């Protein structure tokens, strides 16, 4: 995998200025978290405002954790999202009912868990691999054992979990993901991005 072609998603956006910085840096997607228990949660009202000036070819990803069907539909109706990202224990049937491209996040401890998710969520646009945690649904700042990722998965996968400017090149070289997802590794505090860290993260990948 050529690091220059790695796709990048920056997640947990809560401020317009952080989204604009991500756009200026050339990221492929930004993530909005619609989960009240998250420190990076955004309301529908705020989401409408901060996505207002996102140009074409920068995807908006709605990140959800075990949501009600009606809430997902409301987001689809109100926000111009290109992708849904399910970060809980949602079934494949639940994820596909919205007729919207989706990403299924899992928190694997074994290679078997990863392969099982690829098989179960066969119609997902990608599988996202994040760090297992009993306390947090992403944004832990911790990596997981990349050695468990099977080679030659039949589906594109997104690597997440504890990525930052110091380890991202090693992660890409070792894991060869289709894309990477960064959140806490580019923050000054939860939901507030550090623009210098954002720039350094991009430079570490693309040069």
Swiss-Prot record:
The enzyme's E.C. designation: 5.3.1.24
Statement: the UniProt record of this protein carries the keyword Transcription regulation: no
Swiss-Prot/TrEMBL keywords: Amino-acid biosynthesis, Aromatic amino acid biosynthesis, Isomerase, Tryptophan biosynthesis
Molecular function terms, GO-annotated: phosphoribosylanthranilate isomerase activity
InterPro entries named among the record's database cross-references: Aldolase_TIM, PRAI_dom, RibuloseP-bd_barrel, TrpF_fam
Any single GO BP term: L-tryptophan biosynthetic process
Catalytic reactions on record: N-(5-phospho-beta-D-ribosyl)anthranilate = 1-(2-carboxyphenylamino)-1-deoxy-D-ribulose 5-phosphate
Pathway: Amino-acid biosynthesis; L-tryptophan biosynthesis; L-tryptophan from chorismate: step 3/5
Domain of life: Bacteria
Classification via NCBIfam families: PRK01222.1-4 (NF002298)
The family this protein is said to belong to: Belongs to the TrpF family.
The protein's name in its UniProt record: N-(5'-phosphoribosyl)anthranilate isomerase
Organism expressing this protein natively: Legionella pneumophila (strain Corby)
């Amino acid at each position: 995998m050529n690091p220059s072609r790695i796709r990048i998603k920056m997640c947990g956006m809560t401020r317009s200025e952080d989204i604009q910085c991500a756009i200026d840096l050339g990221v492929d997607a930004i993530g909005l978290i619609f989960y009240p228990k998250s420190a990076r949660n955004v309301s529908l009202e705020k989401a409408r405002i901060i996505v207002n000036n996102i140009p074409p070819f920068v995807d908006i990803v709605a990140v959800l954790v075990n949501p009600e069907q009606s809430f997902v539909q409301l987001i689809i109706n109100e926000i111009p999202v290109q992708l849904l990202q399910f970060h809980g224990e949602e079934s494949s049937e639940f994820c596909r009912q919205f007729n919207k491209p989706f990403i299924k996040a899992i928190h694997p401890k074994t290679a078997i868990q990863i392969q099982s998710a690829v098989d179960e969520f066969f119609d997902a646009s990608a599988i996202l691999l994040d760090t297992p945690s009993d306390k947090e649904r992403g944004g832990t700042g911790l990596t997981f054992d990349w050695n468990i990722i099977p080679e030659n998965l039949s589906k594109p996968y997104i690597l997440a979990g504890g990525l930052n400017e110091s380890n991202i090149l090693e992660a890409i070289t070792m894991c060869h993901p289709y894309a990477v997802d960064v959140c806490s590794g580019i923050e000054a505090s939860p939901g507030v991005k550090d623009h210098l860290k954002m720039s350094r993260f991009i430079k570490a990948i693309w040069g």
